[in-house]
């Protein structure tokens, strides 16, 4: 596995034209959703953020196929119901393509919370890991990751602070959040990891 720190490649369908999000250091940023089909036929709908100058390099149109190269980013949003971790793909390049669907991500970082190991109702072994991935300018992206089977068993025994590399795909998953005012449908974004490499355990 190549240790790139934080890299993702997506190839999918643009659901709608990008919408303005915010400006930072005189750069305008836009947000859009890319639909990436899985081999099973279902699709992950993933949020992407890109600077205006990056988008101008591609002839964007709804329903078109585009290749996105970038990083998985996160930030905490404060709301009345508490802090929420917001996940998106920060696009470094966006290009028109005819390639088949692609969703490949590699992350290198440190486990920052005790891994949570459990079995699904169907008996599948899974392990939830929160990975702290360092970024430039002393920033950190916190990326939820889920591991399966034998890799889940391996991750379950790792301590906080262990340095690991993961490879997999970024997936979207719907769930229901129960709030005092009622139930609310939400979407979670997480790395579904197929490969795990332990770099340093830091016991």
Where are these regions (language model features)?
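Single-stranded nucleic acid-binding surfaces, predominantly the OB-fold ssDNA-binding core
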Residues: 1-203
């Amino acid at each position: 596995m190549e240790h790139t720190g934080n890299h993702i490649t997506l190839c999918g369908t643009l659901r709608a034209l990008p919408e303005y999000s915010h400006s930072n250091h005189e750069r305008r940023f836009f947000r859009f959703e890319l639909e990436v089909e899985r081999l099973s036929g279902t699709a992950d709908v993933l949020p992407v953020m890109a600077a205006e100058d990056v988008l101008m390099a591609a002839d964007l149109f709804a329903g078109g196929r585009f290749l996105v190269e970038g990083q998985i980013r996160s930030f905490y949003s404060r709301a009345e119901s508490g802090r929420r971790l917001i996940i998106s793909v920060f696009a470094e390049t966006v290009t028109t393509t005819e390639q088949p669907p692609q969703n490949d991500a590699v992350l290198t970082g440190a486990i920052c919370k005790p891994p949570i190991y459990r079995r699904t109702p169907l008996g599948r072994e899974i392990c939830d890991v929160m990975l702290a991935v360092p970024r430039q300018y002393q920033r950190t992206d916190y990326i939820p990751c889920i591991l399966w089977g034998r890799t889940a068993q391996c991750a379950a025994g790792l301590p906080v602070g262990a340095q690991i590399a993961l490879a997999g795909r970024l997936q979207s998953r719907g769930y229901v959040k129960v709030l005092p005012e009622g139930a609310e449908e939400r979407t979670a974004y997480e790395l579904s990891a197929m490969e795990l490499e332990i770099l340093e355990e830091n016991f």
